Amino acid sequence: MGETAWTGTPVIPHPDARDNDAEKLPWGGRREKLPMRWPFADAVEGFRSKALANKQYDPASTFVWGQMMAVGLIEMLKAIEAAFGADGHDVARAALRKVGDRIATEMIDGVEKPGDLSPAELSSLFASWINEVAYASIENPKVEGDGASFDIHYCPHEDVYGAFDCRVQRYLVEGMIEAARRHWGDGMIDVAFATTIPSGSRTCHFDMFPKGEGSDKWFEYSDRLRDRALKIVDVK
């Protein structure tokens, strides 16, 4: 990737992002501690039994299809913001949040929290399900005391998106967070990002920490991105 993403958004390539050992990290095993479900379960089974069972089918074509849908959503959001300003942005963000909520609800509905999990452990395992299943990523998670963190070593969008484009994924996560808190209570801890691959880092790093009284870091940063987006399209 050069200094401009496929979407036209600026990026800062990191020389080691392509060689950050993603291929050596474990995937999937820790999720067994929290027995959530795959969303789109019937469709997933159809994909496995029809497409993946076909030895001539290249799963990379599914990747290309997914990127096409993703960049189409970026362009749609930018066009809505340019044409309808704050109202357009808010409607689009709410729609993405609704989708994220529904996906997470399918994953956790009827799932009981193991009694021996701390809020940090529960939040970390929930994040692993979101990272690996919903976002098809490869992560390196840690739980330390009452907090947790994870590094994303591979994200399907890392060579297509610019850093500002990642806000679309953020809005989906808003709904996922709301679903988790509704299901397991407000004890689910807050989350904030520190670095991203498109903004010049080797990995995307996220920190998870106890939610402060009257504070919600994930949603607060989303609001700041809203203001930035509307300035870009010069909304008066």
Predicted features and spans:
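Phosphate-moiety recognition in structured ligand-binding domains
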Residues: 150
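N-terminal accessory segment detector
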Residues: 2-147, 156-172, 179-203, 207, ...
